[in-house]
């Protein structure tokens, strides 16, 4: 038996130190030989007939079922290696005299219930280290003589020395990460900072980011960024609003043209409006020119060019029917008379009168009474009208200087 134990290798299915044979031929040989020898020695030592189909050992109180009733793993591993291990021990103090002839029959230290605890089919992914010594024998009660064979083995509880094969921690992190995504509207700084290095898929519905990166940023920064983009491009002045409104949405800058991507998707009328808006606005010509002298000279030259071109008459300017003509002249006149808000401008001076007044304003912002009377006679206006125009022009220049100064101050800061 010792040679047999040395020859057999440990089974990969049973994490024990006992040697088990995998082949059915070796199992049947071990079972038959040991049952016959055990029955004979038990009958001699105990003085009782050990025959029969079940194989009772009277001195030890152990019932040995036939080999055909034993499931796989109990034939050679569960019971009979213990017989060989008890060969050199002292005779067990059994009730019927004990198996004193060789100790082949299992005595009170019955080893039959051991397969319920040790030789169970453990999971293949989790292997247990073999213990150092054989497991201690368990006492067998006397009432198990009439019990049927042991039930099929139950799955074992996870052993502390088994290697971790499940991914419970990863699943926990994934669930917390999903909760972090769901609670995107009210994230906590610590949780967002802890979960930042994890990879991220497409953003959820609550996130309003246009193009999210592969790594999620902390929640406070992401919310502010999403809020800004949603305000700037989603609802502020997008292409859909340009298509829906009759007049294109005006950007904050003065000389800002709509991007070509938005202009390509707009209608023909919106395209014409964009072309008209890209030209220098003649509102400065009607009520006053730019802030500096160079700007005023440029506005004066543009006014002169418009005056030399075939401009519409005063009647066409006054009548809204001729302003809505489909020709380019009618559109220019309508753009010149119509403010960006859609209302008609109040322009009491003609282009020639405005040009002459702008020229005089370039030379001198404050007029004497004699010079004012001369200008009023040249442009066919009253003295009071010229005085009021110069007052309004000075106020407009002051306002434009203030706006230019604010724009220059804010241009030094890069908010991108």
Swiss-Prot record:
Known DNA-binding region: 342-401
Compartments, record wording: Nucleus
Keywords: Developmental protein, DNA-binding, Homeobox, Nucleus, Transcription, Transcription regulation
Transcription found in the keyword field: yes
GO molecular function per UniProt: DNA binding; DNA-binding transcription activator activity, RNA polymerase II-specific; histone deacetylase binding; RNA polymerase II cis-regulatory region sequence-specific DNA binding
Feature: compositional bias, Pro residues: 131-140, 147-159
Stretches for region Disordered: 40-60, 81-167, 228-345
InterPro entries in the record: HD, HD_metazoa, Homeobox_CS, Homeodomain-like_sf, HXA10/ABDB-like
Biased composition (Low complexity): 300-314
Function noted in UniProt: Sequence-specific transcription factor which is part of a developmental regulatory system that provides cells with specific positional identities on the anterior-posterior axis. Binds to the DNA sequence 5'-AA[AT]TTTTATTAC-3'.
Family designation: Belongs to the Abd-B homeobox family.
Oligomer status and interactors: Interacts with SIRT2; the interaction is direct.
Protein name: Homeobox protein Hox-A10
């Amino acid at each position: 038996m010792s040679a047999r134990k040395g020859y057999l290798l440990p089974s990969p299915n049973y994490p024990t130190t006992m040697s088990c044979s995998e082949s059915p031929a070796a199992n049947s040989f071990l079972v038959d030989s040991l049952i016959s020898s055990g029955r004979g020695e038990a009958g001699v030592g105990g003085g009782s007939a050990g025959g029969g189909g079940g194989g009772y050992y009277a001195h030890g109180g152990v019932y040995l079922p036939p080999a055909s009733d034993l499931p796989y793993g109990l034939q050679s591993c569960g019971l009979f290696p213990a017989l060989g291990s008890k060969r050199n021990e002292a005779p067990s103090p059994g009730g019927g005299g004990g198996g004193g002839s060789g100790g082949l029959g299992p005595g009170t230290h019955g080893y039959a219930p051991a397969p319920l605890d040790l030789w169970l089919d453990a999971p293949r992914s989790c292997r247990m280290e073999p213990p150092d010594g054989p497991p201690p024998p368990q006492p067998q009660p006397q009432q198990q003589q009439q019990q049927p064979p042991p039930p099929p083995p139950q799955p074992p509880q996870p052993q502390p020395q088994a290697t971790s094969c499940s991914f419970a921690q990863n699943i926990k992190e994934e669930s917390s990460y999903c909760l972090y995504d769901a609670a995107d509207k009210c994230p906590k700084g610590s949780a967002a900072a802890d979960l930042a290095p994890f990879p991220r898929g497409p953003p959820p519905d609550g996130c309003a980011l246009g193009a999210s990166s592969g790594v999620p940023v902390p929640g406070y920064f992401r919310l502010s960024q999403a809020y800004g983009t949603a305000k700037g491009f989603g609802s502020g002045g997008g292409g859909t609003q340009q298509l829906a409104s009759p007049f294109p949405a005006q950007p904050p800058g003065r000389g800002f043209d709509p991007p070509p991507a938005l202009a390509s998707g707009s209608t023909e009328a919106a395209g014409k409006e964009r072309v008209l808006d890209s030209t220098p606005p003649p509102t400065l010509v009607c009520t006053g020119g730019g802030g500096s002298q160079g700007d005023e000279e440029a506005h004066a030259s543009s006014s002169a060019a418009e005056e030399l071109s075939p401009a519409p008459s005063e009647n066409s300017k006054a009548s809204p029917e001729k302003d809505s003509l489909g020709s380019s002249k009618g559109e220019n006149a309508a753009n010149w008379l119509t403010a960006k808000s859609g209302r008609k401008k109040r322009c009491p001076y003609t282009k020639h009168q405005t040009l002459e007044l702008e020229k005089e304003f370039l030379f001198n912002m404050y007029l004497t009474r004699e010079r004012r009377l001369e200008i009023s006679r040249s442009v066919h206006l009253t003295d009071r009208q010229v005085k009021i125009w110069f007052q309004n022009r000075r106020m407009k220049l002051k306002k434009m200087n203030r706006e230019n100064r604010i724009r220059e101050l804010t241009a030094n800061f890069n908010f991108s």
